């Protein structure tokens, strides 16, 4: 799959995606124009390895955070690996350009709810952009906006009894500062045929499964670039759906490579929900994903 990815996309400077994934350097891999196709490829390669080593692995439902929503849609058969890789490579380039043009940042807010996050934004914006961008888990919200507003947000959070930390990111993702990227992504999505999903896939914007209308799905993917990711709502709704569908005992939760960040967030959302991570696929599980 990595060899196929190298044939589909070419990174800035002619770097091969496979070499960047396995050998770095980290500084290059951390650029969103490189990290997005890398994450997409790693996730689908991980699933393919699980199937190869352990046999058929039916996907009962899929969700992914930010870029991961494209991985989830590919697993559900909405588009092919190659189509998805081209889309996320375009998304990464557009967001990288918007980030460099807007000089923004992001701040992790610990301990507050949505109302407190809005209060911090109101106090720190001072005419600039500063908005909640990621609702990751209860008590864990990320703000996004102009760099100066992010600096002020750290101070404002402290006065409200909250902890805040600036994140080492390339830009103000999931905020209005990404509007140029959203416009470009809308044009890119027009040229890709979306097929009916084989399973429910949750929208980062609504926190609910996508409907059957391809145009609405594409519009939500565009909105996702400039609107907050409601990951906690996605997970809560997915768990409720799994229980209502009678899948609690048969459909296990799997986090595809790389990393285990989502497993950590799920502990905050529902400690009873067990997530299996697959940074390396040495013991594939023949359970529904």
List each language-model region with its residue ranges.
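Post-His helix in hydrolase/transferase enzymes
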Residues: 181, 288-289
């Amino acid at each position: 799959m990595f060899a196929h990815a190298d044939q589909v996309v070419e990174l800035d400077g002619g770097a091969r995606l496979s070499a960047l994934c396995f050998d770095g350097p980290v500084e290059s891999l951390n650029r969103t124009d490189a990290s997005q196709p890398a994450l997409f490829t790693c996730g689908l390669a991980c699933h393919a390895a699980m199937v190869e080593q352990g046999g058929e692995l039916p996907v009962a439902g899929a969700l992914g955070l930010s870029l991961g929503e494209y991985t989830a849609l590919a697993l559900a058969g909405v588009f092919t690996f190659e189509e998805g890789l081209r889309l996320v490579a375009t998304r990464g380039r557009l967001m990288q350009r918007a980030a460099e043009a807007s000089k923004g940042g992001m701040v992790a807010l610990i301990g507050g709810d949505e109302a407190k996050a809005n209060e911090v934004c109101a106090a720190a914006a001072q005419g600039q952009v500063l908005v909640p961008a990621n609702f990751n888990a209860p008590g864990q919200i990320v703000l996004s906006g102009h760099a100066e507003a992010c600096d002020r947000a750290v101070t404002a959070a402290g006065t409200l009894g909250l902890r805040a930390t600036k994140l080492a990111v390339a830009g103000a993702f999931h905020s209005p500062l990404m509007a140029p990227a959203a416009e470009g992504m809308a044009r890119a999505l027009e040229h890709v045929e979306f097929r009916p999903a084989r399973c429910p896939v949750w929208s980062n914007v609504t926190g609910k499964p996508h409907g059957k209308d391809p145009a609405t799905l594409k519009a939500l993917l565009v909105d996702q670039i400039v609107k907050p990711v409601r990951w906690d709502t996605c997970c809560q709704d997915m768990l409720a759906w799994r229980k209502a569908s009678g899948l609690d005992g048969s459909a296990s939760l799997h986090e595809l490579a790389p990393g285990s960040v989502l497993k950590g967030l799920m502990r905050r959302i529902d400690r009873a929900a067990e997530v299996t991570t697959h940074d390396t696929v040495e013991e594939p599980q023949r359970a529904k994903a």
